Curated annotation (Swiss-Prot):
It is found in: Cytoplasm. Residues 254-258 are annotated as: ACP-binding. It comes from the Bacteria. The keyword Transferase applies. Pathway: Lipid metabolism; fatty acid biosynthesis. GO terms for molecular function: 3-oxoacyl-[acyl-carrier-protein] synthase activity; beta-ketoacyl-acyl-carrier-protein synthase III activity. This is Beta-ketoacyl-[acyl-carrier-protein] synthase III.
Length: 327
């Protein structure tokens, strides 16, 4: 039995934060942001739009697209870098919001690679026969952890949610053909949220030192991102018994246009076949690839046997690649 994606969904908050808005907040410009990142605007969640809420909203659309009832879902995996709480899990909160029966529900914290890790978990469960219908959710309200006085990070991130339903392959679904994942904790300090966990719990000092905001070593992250995603993608292609020219669409993590372009060049993918949502939504962390995949499927006809290559990179450091094929 092979696992496949039955349906996808996404959710974006209504509030738009443009580059022009950021010009009024920090020392930056639309030209500076656009040329360095490719981002024009991003969505910012309201006080009521937390990660579990956005994920649940995306899940409703995925369930509808999959043409199933909520009662068929027998496991929930929630990928996030910005959970509502350390506990209870955002998966359990989304489960309650959706009114889904008391099935296993847990979080997966792999930052921006989360959607791919979630797909991998769902694939393994379905193909092992452990569960028949797994709901994978990825959502992040990263604006809660962005320092809007730091122009190097505040221009990058936006909020959003994505989801998909994974089950045994059926006609019209997207078969999850091959997965390759990796992580390197030795490089963890390059991209992290320093305080708030058990190693560095919240205190007056951590607040005064602004340690509850995202920190990033941009140049080092860029180098690792391109190299690691290229490795994961090429390994995936080789293990699937394919050639690079067999890939019809590239759906990358929407982090930075320079990173996306660097990956596309390494695979000689035509620009029209590299799907981007970056300019509209910025980097939406774990939900990024899922949002892009959902938008691609809703705006383009993916023909039978076409293959999609998903690639992502995030904190951990973590990375991954997944090959999907239209059934």
């Amino acid at each position: 039995m092979r696992a496949s994606i039955w349906g996808t969904g996404s959710y974006l908050p209504k509030k738009v934060l443009t580059n022009a808005d950021l010009e009024k907040m920090v020392e930056t410009s639309d030209e500076w942001i656009s040329t360095r990142t490719g981002i024009k605007e991003r969505r910012i969640a309201s006080a009521e739009e937390f990660s579990s809420f956005m994920g649940a909203k995306a899940a409703e659309k995925a369930i509808e697209a999959a043409k199933i009832s909520k009662s068929q879902i027998d496991c929930i995996v929630f990928a996030t870098a910005a959970p509502d709480y350390i506990f209870p899990s955002s998966a359990a909160l989304a489960q309650a919001y959706l009114g889904i029966k008391e099935v296993p529900a847990f979080d997966c914290l792999v930052a921006c690679t989360g959607f791919l890790y979630g797909l991998s978990i769902a694939k393994a469960y379905v193909e092992a026969g452990m569960y028949q219908c797994v709901l994978v959710i990825a959502a992040d309200k990263l604006s809660s952890f962005v320092n809007y006085e730091d122009r190097n990070t505040c221009v990058l991130f936006g909020d959003g949610g994505s989801a998909c339903v994974v089950g045994p392959s059926r006609p019209g679904s997207l078969k999850i053909s091959k997965v390759n994942l990796g992580a390197d904790g030795k490089q963890g300090d390059l991209l992290r949220l320093p305080a708030g966990g058990s190693r560095c719990p919240a205190s007056q000092d951590t607040i005064q030192n602004q340690q509850h905001f995202i920190t990033m070593e941009g140049k080092e992250v860029f180098k690792h991102a391109v190299r690691r995603m290229e490795f994961a993608a090429k390994t995936c292609i080789t293990e699937a018994g394919l050639q690079e020219e067999d890939i019809d669409w590239l759906v990358p993590h929407q982090a930075n246009e320079r990173i996306i372009d660097a990956i596309a060049k390494r695979f000689a993918v035509e620009d029209s076949r590299v799907f981007k949502t970056l300019a509209k939504y910025g980097n939406t962390a774990a939900s990024s690839v899922g949002i892009a995949l959902d938008e691609l499927l809703r705006t383009h006809d993916i023909h039978s046997k076409e293959r999609l290559l998903l690639v992502a990179f995030g904190g951990g450091l973590s990375w991954g690649a997944v090959i999907l094929q239209q059934m």
